[in-house]
Curated annotation (Swiss-Prot):
The gene is rpl15e. It holds the Pfam family Ribosomal_L15e. Gene3D superfamilies: Ribosomal protein l15e. GO terms for cellular component: cytosolic large ribosomal subunit. GO terms for molecular function: RNA binding; structural constituent of ribosome. GO terms for biological process: cytoplasmic translation. Belongs to the eukaryotic ribosomal protein eL15 family. InterPro entries: Rbsml_eL15_core_dom_sf, Ribosomal_eL15, Ribosomal_eL15_arc, Ribosomal_eL15_CS, Ribosomal_uL23/eL15/eS24_sf. This is Large ribosomal subunit protein eL15.
Length: 182
């Protein structure tokens, strides 16, 4: 029942109590390491909707990624500015997917389950990534999540098999005309 109030507050975070909370938290988050394991999710409603459970084998990691398009260096060799390929270069991967992959590299024994947006400022976006340990007995014995222990689910995030990866690859669209998206 209480999750509903949390969910409503996070729908418009700048118009609710979340703004004051983040006013205190955001400066600390900027000083924290880029990838930091946290005790419990900031958005418990979102985390649980995406599969998080408060039990052994699950961890939540907060990560910070740059905002905006790709940063490319301007080289010294001569050519027209148009042909330099510095401005307006965007990656095929979303910022969220980049965040998930970085976390997965930091925790090689874990599998990424999903992630969600937490906050953003002028320079960074903050995401919380839910990780699952496929070798943990609590996970192996849980009928809801034991599928992640099977070998074909190793490195799912790098193969674009989680939610954001499927979205980036245009797999949300089905039927005739979907070829144009991919």
């Amino acid at each position: 029942m209480m999750y509903r109030y949390v969910k409503d507050a996070w729908k418009n975070p700048k118009d609710s109590y979340v703004r004051e909370l983040m006013w205190e938290r955001a400066p600390k988050w900027r000083r924290d390491p880029v990838i930091k394991r946290i005790e419990r999710p900031t958005r418990i409603d979102r985390a649980r909707a995406l599969g998080y459970r408060a039990k052994p084998g699950y961890i939540v990691v907060r990560t910070r990624v740059r905002r905006g398009s790709q940063r490319k260096t301007r080289f010294k060799a001569g050519r027209r500015p148009t042909r330099m390929g510095v401005k307006k270069i965007t990656t095929a991967k979303s910022i969220k997917r980049i965040a998930e992959e970085r976390v997965a590299r930091k925790y090689p024994n874990m599998e990424v389950l999903n992630s969600y947006w937490v906050w953003e400022d002028g320079k960074y976006k903050f995401y919380e990534v839910i990780l699952v340990d496929p070798n943990h007995l609590a996970i192996k014995n849980d009928p809801k999540i034991y599928w992640i222990c099977v070998k074909q689910h190793r490195g799912r995030v790098f193969r674009g098999l989680i939610s954001e990866g499927k979205k980036n690859r245009g797999l949300r669209n089905r039927g005739k005309g979907a070829e144009k998206v991919r």
